[in-house]
Regions:
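Short, acidic/small-residue loops that bind anionic groups at enzyme active sites
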Residues: 87-108
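Hydrophobic structural segments
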Residues: 31, 110-112
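A short, Lys/Arg-enriched amphipathic alpha-helix followed by its capping loop at the start of a domain
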Residues: 19-31
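Short, well-structured alpha-helical segments in soluble
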Residues: 52-69
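Periplasmic-binding protein-like
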Residues: 6-7, 67-77
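Active-site rim beta-loop-alpha module in soluble metabolic enzymes
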Residues: 126-149
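N-terminal beta-loop-helix "entrance" segment that forms/cooperates
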Residues: 36-56, 149
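Short beta-strand segments enriched in small/hydrophobic residues
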Residues: 1-16, 112-116, 144
Length: 149
């Protein structure tokens, strides 16, 4: 049986049930999926500081998950805190929903747009597109002044 570890890099338990329900609709019955939050993390990821604060907790959780026999990990936040550091430390695949979404959108469309919460998110995702070498595909990016919670 395959085992996938999904880490929500926030302290709130608000999205655990919803994430489990979404995953159960698309995952094979032969795959076990464990979804968890991170006590001690920010309640939401809305700033660079929030992301930085959550990153080491994400990395620690993913390293532990690999030791517990998980075959892959998913970081359930578009900001992908701790993604690259996790990949340095484990041998299993680690996906961030932000990076993965951008790659898939870039494959499916000639240009993409990113609309997110938080007035500073435009700069965050433009930087992410530059780092990924996909900035030329970005047609539009904006951050709306909406809190995550």
């Amino acid at each position: 049986m395959r085992r996938i570890f999904v880490v929500l890099p926030v302290s709130t338990e608000k999205w655990i049930k919803e994430t489990k329900e979404c995953v159960s609709k698309v995952i094979s019955g032969a795959t076990e999926v464990h979804v968890t939050n991170l006590p001690g993390a920010p309640t939401s990821i809305e700033t660079y500081y929030d992301s930085a604060k959550a990153a080491s907790l994400v990395v620690d959780a993913i390293v532990k998950a690999e030791m517990e026999g998980y075959n892959a990990a998913v970081i359930g936040c578009f900001e992908d805190p701790g993604l690259h550091a996790s990949r340095e430390l484990v041998s299993m695949p680690v996906l961030g929903i932000g990076e993965t979404s951008i790659v898939i959108a870039s494959i499916l469309g000639k240009r993409i747009a990113i609309i997110s919460t938080g007035r500073n998110s435009r700069a965050v995702y433009e930087r992410k597109m530059i780092e990924m070498g996909l900035y030329r595909k970005l047609a539009y990016s904006c951050g709306m002044e909406l809190p995550v919670l």
